[in-house]
């Protein structure tokens, strides 16, 4: 009787279930087509806004990996993003390096700094770790101002080489390479694309690669180890997880992803300044991750869309209030819906599934 009931319960669900994979694939195909075609249909300002969503999402994904999957709280990821942006501007403008090389150096530098900052995580957790990273976010703009000869000080850096850079012979040596860098991130002639469209597609490729990297990582044995550490560090260590190495390397990897977001920031804005990388940016990234759902991969992308969208609709003279709004939203979400939007979605999905199963149960038993 029980076996037949089990069969009869599952059989009504089977026909639509067979269509789900095709529906899912079709949805992703439509989504991909829309994403690829958007730059052709939108104005330049709107394309740049979508590019902003992508660099915020990349940095928020790195933060979600650290906070949502590994349980380490960081209020300093704005500093890692700023490091990536400054390294990119300095290397490309002053030394004529390619954007690719500058990005690689930025990622390595952020990884090293992330590992150094992550070392205290071996001893402290929770609010105390958050305070350590908060100190980093607070210090970063001051450090940028202090080393003004390199960073441009409180004014920041743009596409022009820093004042007094080198003599005429050195400028001639760098020559054409540096001149090209001072033109910004331009679309190659063979693409036939406007600069904003080319930038969008490059950002899209980077965002997709980062998304796939994080997805594969969290679904691997390493990802299961990260979650085990988050849930119970002692039990994870007993189970054979190398807790110290996992925590430090995760911090470094998370910082590297934020630095990629910083590279994208520099490419998009063609300028950096200390005021762009204050504690407010770190809070914004944390809100993007937590609001969408730091324990999911899609969540930070949703959160980034909302964050950038809110900035877009808030009047220019009221932008200073957005950080207050984001802070309030962060507190509210952590109290009411710790899993963020994706957490609420999963709960509703589970309730609907249980409700459907309950409705089918009486007919199945008859």
Q: What is the role of each PLM region?
A:
Residues 2-366:
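Transmembrane alpha-helices and adjacent helix-loop boundaries
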